[in-house]
Amino acid sequence: MPSEKTFKQRRTFEQRVEDVRLIREQHPTKIPVIIERYKGEKQLPVLDKTKFLVPDHVNMSELIKIIRRRLQLNANQAFFLLVNGHSMVSVSTPISEVYESEKDEDGFLYMVYASQETFGMKLSV
């Protein structure tokens, strides 16, 4: 069972900065993304991992399809993705643009997902 602690709670700021430095050094065309289930989410499963290296040319709709597939959701199940705790992002936006505008000070791009429009904003496919 995955930990109830968030990625930021499990790794120190210094560890996260070093993780990003190594990732960007070894994979310069990949975006380091942390995707976690919204803390109040009950219907959607927890992902088997939280850290993803997303090719920088991928757009948000492709990323959503990948996450939906990993969660094994059917077409009728609602799925909303929130970037950096507050942002609604167009599904046609490349992940590289989202990363540049929304990355955390540690260098990761953080996202949470839920089955409802819990956030007041939504990104759905």
Swiss-Prot record:
Compartments it resides in: Cytoplasmic vesicle, Autophagosome membrane; Endomembrane system; Mitochondrion membrane; Cytoplasm, Cytoskeleton
Effect of G120A: No processing of precursor. No lipidation. Decreases C18 ceramide binding
Effect of I35A: Decreases C18 ceramide binding
Recorded GO CC terms: autophagosome; autophagosome membrane; axoneme; cytoplasmic vesicle; cytosol; endomembrane system; microtubule; mitochondrial membrane
Taxonomy, superkingdom: Eukaryota
Residue positions of covalent lipid attachment, annotated as Phosphatidylethanolamine amidated glycine: G120
Tissue expression as described in the entry: Most abundant in heart, brain, skeletal muscle and testis. Little expression observed in liver.
GO biological process: autophagosome assembly; autophagosome maturation; autophagy; cellular response to nitrogen starvation; cellular response to starvation; macroautophagy; mitophagy
Effect of mutating K122A: No effect on processing of precursor
GO molecular-function term, one example from the UniProt record: ubiquitin protein ligase binding
Effect of F119A: Impaired localization to autophagosomes
Effect of Q116P: Abolished delipidation by ATG4 family proteins
Keywords: Autophagy, Cytoplasm, Cytoplasmic vesicle, Cytoskeleton, Lipoprotein, Membrane, Microtubule, Mitochondrion, Phosphoprotein, Ubl conjugation, Ubl conjugation pathway
Sites marked Cleavage: G120, M121
Lipid anchor positions (Phosphatidylserine amidated glycine): G120
Topology of this chain in the membrane: Lipid-anchor
Family: Belongs to the ATG8 family.
The protein's role, per its UniProt record: Ubiquitin-like modifier involved in formation of autophagosomal vacuoles (autophagosomes). Plays a role in mitophagy which contributes to regulate mitochondrial quantity and quality by eliminating the mitochondria to a basal level to fulfill cellular energy requirements and preventing excess ROS production.
Protein name stated in the entry: Microtubule-associated protein 1 light chain 3 beta
